[in-house]
Swiss-Prot record:
InterPro entries: AAE_transporter (IPR050144), RCK_C (IPR006037), RCK_C_sf (IPR036721), Transpt_YidE_put (IPR023018), YidE_YbjL (IPR006512)
GO cellular component, one term: plasma membrane
Protein name stated in the entry: Putative transport protein YidE
Organism listed in the record: Salmonella heidelberg (strain SL476)
GO terms of molecular function: monoatomic cation transmembrane transporter activity
GO biological process per UniProt: potassium ion transport
Keywords: Cell membrane, Membrane, Repeat, Transmembrane, Transmembrane helix, Transport
Transmembrane regions: 4-24, 28-48, 65-85, 95-115, 158-178, 371-391, 393-413, 437-457, 464-484, 493-513, 533-553
């Protein structure tokens, strides 16, 4: 058997063993995809004992390409919501998550200085303690750039594996500890979260208002400032028994019922100006109007603003709301359409069908993957990661590398959505498949390279010490920030758990947090809010630590 065939066969065996290990769960918690690392260590140990030689060049390529696939698909997935998460609504969560990252780096620096831990080892412990695989890849790359021997670079994977198990357990123990210390009632916390959402600014809601302000009688909708803004959409108007789709030029009269869509605060402001909120139904049932959701799949409308498509003027159809990447938005006239946007339309059946034809509404296209944008994005990401950033006093130039470059490029492209006929939307199933494939390949190679010396290091070397260092790096930031967030910021417990899981970019911890309450989405929401920024920082941090430690000698 050739070296290439043997290498592929061994990698397949690693994946099988590792995924089987990952599926083993204790009280609903397992290693998940991280099991592949331990599968690689097990197989690598026996491969080393048998004296089998694998293709080093091929293993290196597979490791790097797997990492690129993983971080690129993450960026494409979270890109549409990344920049929004940095705004005020998620600022507090992101600040606490960033504090966890910074504290982890500081604890790592202190341990390195006090105990003189070798640089590759301490970076591996850091990456494993925070359960972040791309950090491992970024750290290994910067070490190679610094001229570190290959055998020492491989030590990073070994120390990563030592610290990884408690990295997962440490998050779960912190969640349990917070619940114990503050005597948390999970059901009550879930109800508080739902109440805060209902009273907050994040949900798009509707309100039916009767026109009672005499100053608005016989005025056109476009002449009423509150109705001629991008914050409120008037999607239906009922006069006597007639329901209609209003246009900007529609004249409103006293007694008209308006169906408005917007955020709660804006709806309240509109109600103060227009009149009184009523419980009267403005349903399209039994009328010649209907409400339908259509999806944007036509390349010709991608990037065009809603106002430029003139749906109201041409088809007498109103877009009442827009759903992008699972987030409900007011359909602002300045909003540009992206592939996969879901539009809520109100109008007559024939008119809605006409608009659906314009925007595409081809459901099968949502399951298709444009491969050209994928490789354009990966290529641009690799180029971005290769650009050197020279910092005075540093021995080597900083680079985003193969972990950071594709991630940043994917975030940007995911936010842009489309350029001409190229769109960076990827079906969730395809994104997940590529992401899982990438991380399996990466972890399999890391495990194989670490497996030969793993047992000896654990039983006869410094393996137990490495585990101890990892416990400090995991526990100190999580417990400290958890206490601060709960005591001073009065953070909801479920939101706190999601933030802690997101700060470690740890899906098993998110699964545990989600299981705390069957119906609440609080943990998943906070996890998604902090995940993009934290992932970026986790990739950059080991590079900064490596350069700083290297410069300190």
């Amino acid at each position: 058997m050739s070296d290439i065939a043997l290498t592929v066969s061994v990698l397949a065996l690693v994946a099988v063993v590792g995924l089987w290990i990952g599926n083993i769960k204790v009280r609903g918690v397992g290693f998940g995809i991280g099991g592949v690392l331990f599968g690689g260590i097990i197989v690598g140990h026996f491969v080393d004992q048998a004296g089998v030689t694998l293709s080093g060049d091929m293993l290196h390529f597979i490791q790097e390409f797997g990492l690129i696939l993983f971080v690129y698909t993450i960026g494409i997935q979270v890109g549409p919501g990344f920049f929004a998460s940095l705004r005020v609504s998620g600022l507090r969560l992101n600040l606490f998550a960033v504090l966890i990252v910074i504290m982890g780096g500081l604890v790592t620096a202190i341990l390195h200085k006090i105990f003189a831990i070798p640089l590759p080892v301490v970076l591996g412990i850091f990456s494993g303690a925070v359960t972040n695989t791309p950090a491992l890849g970024a750290g290994q790359q910067i070490l190679r750039d610094l001229g570190t021997p290959v055998d020492l670079v491989d030590q990073m994977g070994m120390s990563y594996a030592m610290a990884y198990p408690f990295g997962i357990c440490g998050i779960l123990l912190t969640m349990w500890l917070m619940r114990l210390i503050f005597r948390v009632n999970v059901e009550a916390e879930a109800q508080k979260h739902e109440s805060s959402l209902a009273n907050g600014h994040s949900l798009i809601q509707t309100m039916n208002i009767r026109v009672e302000n005499p100053n608005l009688n016989n005025m056109a909708i476009q002449d009423v400032p509150i109705l001629n803004s991008d914050k409120i959409i008037c999607s239906r108007l009922k006069r006597d028994d007639t329901l209609m789709v209003p246009s900007p030029g529609t004249i409103i009269q006293a007694g008209d019922l308006l169906h408005l869509v917007g955020q709660p605060t804006d709806l309240h402001n509109a109600q103060l100006v227009i009149g009184k909120e009523v419980d009267t139904s403005l349903s399209t049932r039994g009328t010649d109007l209907r409400v339908e959701r259509v999806v944007v799949t036509n390349e010709k409308v991608l990037g065009k603003r809603i106002r430029d498509l003139h749906f109201k003027e041409r088809y007498d159809v109103v877009i009442s709301r827009l759903n992008r990447a699972g987030v409900e938005l007011v359909a602002s006239s300045d909003a540009s359409l992206q592939f996969g946007d879901i539009l809520n339309l109100v109008g007559r059946p024939a008119s809605i069908d006409a608009v659906a034809n314009v925007v595409g509404n081809a459901q099968q296209k949502l399951q298709q993957v444009q491969m050209l944008p994928v490789f354009i994005g990966i290529g641009l990401g690799v180029l971005l990661g290769s650009i050197p950033l020279f910092v005075p006093g540093f021995p080597v130039a900083l680079k985003l590398g193969l972990a950071g470059g594709p991630l940043i490029m994917a975030l940007i492209l995911g936010r842009i959505g489309s350029i001409g006929k190229l769109y960076w939307f990827m079906p969730p199933s395809a994104n997940l498949a590529l992401r899982e494939l990438g991380i399996v390949l990466f972890l399999a190679v890391v495990g194989l390279k670490s497996g030969g010396d793993f047992v000896d290091t654990l039983t006869q070397g410094e393996g137990l010490s490495w585990i101890g260092y990892g416990i400090f790096i995991t526990a100190i930031p999580l417990i400290t920030v958890g206490l601060l967030a709960r005591i001073f910021a009065k953070m909801n417990y479920l939101t706190l758990c999601g933030m802690l899981a997101g700060s470690m970019t740890d899906p098993p911890a998110l699964a545990f947090a989600n299981n705390l309450h069957a119906t609440s989405g609080a943990a998943a929401l906070s996890y998604a809010t902090v995940y993009p920024l934290v992932m970026f920082l986790r990739i950059i941090t080991p590079q900064l630590l490596a350069v700083i430690f290297w410069g300190m000698g």
